[in-house]
């Protein structure tokens, strides 16, 4: 039974929980709880359909704009889950004749998105950018997408985004970094 999202109590002993995604401890933040209650009173619990059908609201649009401003980006697109985001984004970026070169320890959603995209899918040894470069050099087609987590959720390793960016530019490849476990 959770005492908070960062620990669990089993047989009267408290243990650290590694199953939480509440990295910033916002789940029990009083300000967020208050804002959520106000939003529930104003908008109800559900839009009763997905954004694709009729569930996209002015609040969703406002959130996208605020995230874009925070990140200094032109646009933001909300997805219901990180898993869906990875599937949707990867499929939008590659076609069947393209190459995906991905870190071996990427999150399952990145692996599934890569496989489901039907692009040529290759994996390089974890955080081994020389291996990445060897694989890119063997790719026959021009359009390559390099994919990596920034923070690997299962072991806490951090990708070297600067090196990945340099390799991507050098080989005229696109780069997709999943920030789900770092930025959130």
Language-model segment annotations:
Residues 25-26, 53-56, 108, 151-155, ...:
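Short, small-residue-enriched loops and turns at beta-alpha junctions
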Residues 122, 126-177:
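Active-site phosphate-binding strand-loop segment of PLP-dependent enzymes
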Residues 89-108, 129:
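Conserved PLP-anchoring active-site segment centered on the Schiff-base-forming lysine
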Residues 81, 101-117:
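Substrate-binding/gating loop at the entrance of the active-site cleft, primarily
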Residues 96, 117-118, 171:
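Short, structured coil segments at secondary-structure junctions
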Residues 1-45, 173:
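N-terminal "arm"/small-domain region of PLP-dependent enzymes with the aminotransferase-like
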């Amino acid at each position: 039974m959770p005492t908070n999202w960062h620990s669990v109590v089993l047989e009267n002993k408290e243990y650290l929980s590694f199953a939480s995604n509440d990295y910033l401890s916002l789940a029990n933040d009083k300000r967020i709880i208050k804002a959520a209650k106000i939003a529930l009173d104003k908008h109800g619990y559900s839009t009763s359909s997905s954004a694709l059908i009729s569930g996209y609201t002015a609040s969703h649009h406002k959130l996208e704009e605020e995230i874009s401003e925070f990140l200094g980006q032109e646009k933001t697109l909300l997805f219901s889950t990180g898993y869906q985001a990875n599937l949707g984004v990867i499929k939008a970026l590659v076609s069947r004749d393209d190459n995906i070169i991905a870190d071996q320890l990427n999150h399952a959603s990145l692996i599934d998105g890569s496989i489901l995209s039907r692009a040529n899918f290759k994996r390089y040894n974890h955080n081994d950018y020389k291996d990445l470069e060897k694989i890119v050099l063997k790719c026959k087609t021009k359009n390559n997408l390099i994919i990596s987590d920034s923070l690997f959720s299962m072991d806490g390793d951090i990708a070297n985004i600067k090196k990945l960016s340099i390799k991507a530019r050098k080989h005229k490849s696109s780069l997709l970094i999943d920030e789900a476990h770092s930025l959130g």
